[in-house]
């Protein structure tokens, strides 16, 4: 959700500051099929979580870790593009948090309530995986590397209430920087390789 917001904000900022959307066609992201695979795998894992059809938690958690490994690989080979340094840091932070917590991203019950998911919290015991997400309800005292987990809250009236991690914020900033920077490059400048 945070990355989606960053894309729209960056496009708006780029346009308001007289950037050219046509320049975005210049971006050449190497290994982009791995990024598509990562997004598809994560969407499948999150979408099938509620139906319990993806298998036991280790398999599902493994799918979430795998998506972040793929994202980190794509970010690493594109490190020379504007914003990809932040994307690498964010993807690495998320991967470390996931691995440290068994492949799931801890989120506090208070954060879930703040974004309007009281019913979900009431139904879940501490340590239970959150259906339809990669999250697990854990208080800060039980989460490994708590500072890297989903601790930032975007509550209502935000259009898409969500919780985010430090990694999510870094990835969002990197994506936003890539978009704005690219919109302000002239068409003669090649971005990426």
Task: Give, region by region, the residue ranges found by the protein language model.
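Transmembrane alpha-helical insertion/packing segments
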Residues: 1-67
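A cytosolic-side transmembrane-helix exit/cap motif
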Residues: 53-56, 82-87, 104-115
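Membrane-interface loop-to-helix entry segments
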Residues: 58-66, 161-173
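Transmembrane alpha-helices and membrane-interface helical segments
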Residues: 70, 174-181
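Interfacial segments of alpha-helical transmembrane regions
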Residues: 70-101
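Extracytosolic (periplasmic/ER-lumenal) interhelical loops and adjacent juxtamembrane/interface segments
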Residues: 112-163
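Membrane-interface capping segments at transmembrane-helix boundaries
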Residues: 180-192
């Amino acid at each position: 959700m945070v990355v989606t917001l960053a894309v729209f904000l960056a496009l708006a900022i780029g346009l308001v500051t007289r950037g050219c959307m046509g320049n975005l066609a210049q971006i050449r992201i190497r290994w982009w099929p791995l990024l598509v695979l990562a997004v598809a795998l994560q969407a499948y894992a999150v979408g099938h979580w509620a139906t319990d059809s993806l298998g036991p938690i280790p398999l599902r958690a493994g799918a979430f870790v795998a998506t972040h490994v793929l994202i980190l690989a794509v970010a690493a080979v594109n490190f020379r593009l504007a914003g990809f340094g932040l994307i690498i840091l964010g993807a690495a932070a998320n991967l470390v948090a996931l691995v440290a917590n068994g492949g799931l991203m801890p989120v506090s019950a208070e954060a879930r309530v703040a974004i309007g998911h009281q019913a979900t919290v009431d139904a879940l015991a501490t340590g239970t995986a959150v259906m339809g997400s990669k999250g697990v309800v854990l208080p800060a005292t039980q989460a490994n590397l708590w500072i890297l987990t989903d601790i930032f809250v975007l509550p209502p009236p935000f259009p898409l209430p969500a919780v985010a991690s430090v990694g999510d914020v870094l990835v969002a900033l990197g994506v936003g920087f890539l978009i704005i920077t690219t919109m302000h490059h002239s068409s003669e400048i090649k971005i990426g390789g």
